[in-house]
Amino acid sequence: MAKKWLFSALLIAIAISLATPAYSQILRPAEPEIAAKAWILIDATTGKVLLERNADEQLPPASLAKMMTTYIVSNEIAAQRLQEDSEVLISDNAWILGGAKTDGSTMFLSPRTKVSVLDLMHGVIIQSGNDAAIALAEHIAGSEYAFADMMNQQAEILGMRNTEYLNATGLPAAGMVTSARDLGIIASAIIRDHPEYYEIYAKKYFEHNNINQPNRNRLLWRDNSVDGLKTGHTSEAGYCLVSSAKRRGMRLIAVVMGASSDESRARESQKLLSYGFRYYDTKVVYPAGEILKTGAKVWYGAEEFLNLTIAEDVTLTVPRGSEKNLKANILVSDLIKAPVTAGQELGQLHVSLDGEALVDIPLVAEKSIPKAGIFSQLFDWIILLFTRLLS
């Protein structure tokens, strides 16, 4: 009887040990079906692409072009070539092409009046005002045409390979195109380079000329983690939305182009964000300054050994629960010779996940090591000589 109970207990133990890993695994469903012409989901910190479809297809940008307009304005302010409180004269041209008499989105600016740069930025970002975008373009570059050239130069600097700007508004123009991937790039740049102005994208209303207009980004009302960015719509482009949200310290950017309606672009964007936050994590796997290699041999130095570290955080975006499967491979220079300067690159950290290379990071000297005295150097030289002869 005792043997029978022992055998039964053993079977139960084996069954539990086999079943437990299945419960601990995170199941990831198929990618969500997105009803749009093109889309992409990226992590804003690491640039990791989580989902994409037709992300490099050139499509009309609609008002998403205004993201570059406000990015350049922010750059001009940061470079002190422009001030927030600078007064901008609203031209007849800005009023005619983008004002209240048009069918497009407008800030309802009055011609030949003056409005501050900061108010115009609010009008572009929140109200998607075409008149405000044209006024800013003319103020900075003299004409909207010249400003579009600045936009294209900036796009090239940022690596936006499939974008061509012809105006500051995104109003239809033959040959004016962008892509979902490029929109992810400019959104990342706005968040990274100008956080002081990014908060404008989260505002739900802005009032000018006693007219209070809502932000057209529906996700601002539906999801407290969403804090930007921009909507766009023309008959040619369809309904577009670049959105961003932050949860658990992780920021994602979703781009949806060519949806069928205002509701659809919000719904499809929410699908992307929800999928990304549920099934991915962005974490610092190695903090800056962490010692990753101890006792690296230093020849001809006043000290014999040196620690190697990393200069910046190693941040990765990986499927949730897969962090334990990360593999780190450390390669150190074959021969480290003094003098060594703190921060000098002396090796590489290779990180992979399930055989896929994720990142290569330089390993650097933790501190400086000067040359040793002449006799110590001679001693090391003799040891190295014999080592080479024997090998």
Positions of predicted regions on the chain:
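Structural motif marking the loop-to-transmembrane transition
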Residues: 2-3, 61, 113, 117, ...
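Bacterial N-terminal signal peptides
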Residues: 8-17
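Hydrophobic alpha-helical membrane context
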Residues: 15-16, 78, 280
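Domain-terminus/edge residues, biased toward the C-terminal soluble/receptor-binding domains
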Residues: 160-164, 172-391
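Bacterial N-terminal signal peptides that target proteins for export
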Residues: 1-9
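Protein maturation boundaries and topogenic segments
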Residues: 3, 20-23
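Hydrophobic alpha-helical segments, especially transmembrane helices
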Residues: 4-5, 67, 247
